[in-house]
């Protein structure tokens, strides 16, 4: 069986069977929101909590939207696992007054064309049956239909400049999940902060799903997305080879009992890390590299044009070529409406 079809069938089987279980679970319930956004940040291994100085801050650290002096728009598209999974992202942010910013971000993760064999098993007489243990029963290809699995997340972001070196912000998240005839909705909250204690040193923190996010399925099943604490630091080293280099590191603390799936764990608490750097030459182009929380090596590059930033990132798992999943390529753009009439009001 082709690898793509096998993966699609696995997703559908696991999803459908899990939806019928009337239990409350928390592990990996919000994993689709952990994929990261933006070619710039992803090229740095996702180490962006302390940087977060563009429109993608609505995802990485809501406080970072306070950095904006002009409105920004961002778009990203990615096809993962051999083009089986489509991942799209879009965001808009605007500065307001002297110290506020507002934004909206949308993420969609989708698998289309999943074979649905639930009504395709027939007995020797051609009657649809559901007994998979009877070796005489066979799949009738003409009865196989298709369905989609879609996960959506909508972020509404508020950010404020509290002082010149301290910003804070918050997200309201609305979640929508669909698989075949099943659907779920949820709402959650994030809070974040940015602090620069010294010139060129940046510290950040973001508590995702701070109140624990409830995702309720129409089957009666409820999933809880546990809080995740993300903390990070970045330092900008200026005047190197005509530009600057900025190393960054993030640490994720989760409370989902992930154990061996993480870099380290202590009881139900798990720890993951992101590390990366960016070299920017004269604010014209950038090169990046990093290592993320799912053990992928990442590289990337970016070009700054008038009012437009184009960024690309590449990620590869560290396993051997035979064992690892396909590579990921992501391209994103950021449009900055850098005109006097759109500039933040400075009183």
Please report, for each region that a protein language model flagged, where it lies by residue:
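Sec/Tat signal peptide C-region and signal peptidase I cleavage site
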Residues: 17-21
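Subset of outer-membrane beta-barrel
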Residues: 22-347
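Bacterial N-terminal signal peptides
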Residues: 8-16
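Bacterial N-terminal signal peptides that target proteins for export
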Residues: 1-9
């Amino acid at each position: 069986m082709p690898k793509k079809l096998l993966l699609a069938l696995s997703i559908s089987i696991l999803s459908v069977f899990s939806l019928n279980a009337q239990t409350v679970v928390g592990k990996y319930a919000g994993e689709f929101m952990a994929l990261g956004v933006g070619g710039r940040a992803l090229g740095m291994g996702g180490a962006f909590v302390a940087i977060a100085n563009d429109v993608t801050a609505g995802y990485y650290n809501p406080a970072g939207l306070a950095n904006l002096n002009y409105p920004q728009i961002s778009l990203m598209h990615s096809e993962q696992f051999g083009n089986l999974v489509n991942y799209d992202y879009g965001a808009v942010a605007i500065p307001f007054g002297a110290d506020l910013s507002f934004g909206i971000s949308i993420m969609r993760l989708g698998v289309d064309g999943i074979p649905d064999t639930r009504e395709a098993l027939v007995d020797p007489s051609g009657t649809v049956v559901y007994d998979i243990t009877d070796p005489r029963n066979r799949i009738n290809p003409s009865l196989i239909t298709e369905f989609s699995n879609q996960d959506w997340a909508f972020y509404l972001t508020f950010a404020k400049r509290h002082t010149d070196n301290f910003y804070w912000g918050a997200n309201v998240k609305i979640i929508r999940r669909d698989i075949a005839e099943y659907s779920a909705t949820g709402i959650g909250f994030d809070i974040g902060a940015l602090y620069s204690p010294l010139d060129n040193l940046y510290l950040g923190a973001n508590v995702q799903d701070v109140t624990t996010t409830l995702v309720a399925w129409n089957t009666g099943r409820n999933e809880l997305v546990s809080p995740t604490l993300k903390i990070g630091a970045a330092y900008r080293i200026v005047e190197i080879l005509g530009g600057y280099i900025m190393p960054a590191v993030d640490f994720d603390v989760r409370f989902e009992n992930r154990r061996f799936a993480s870099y380290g764990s202590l009881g139900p608490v798990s720890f993951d890390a992101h590390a990366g750097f960016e070299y920017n030459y004269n604010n014209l182009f950038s090169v990046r590299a990093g290592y993320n929380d799912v053990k992928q090596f990442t590289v990337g590059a970016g070009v700054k044009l008038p009012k437009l930033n184009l960024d690309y990132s590449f990620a590869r798992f560290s396993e051997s070529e035979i064992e690892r999943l396909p590579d990921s390529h992501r391209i994103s753009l950021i449009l900055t409406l850098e005109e006097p009439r759109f500039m933040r009001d400075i009183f």
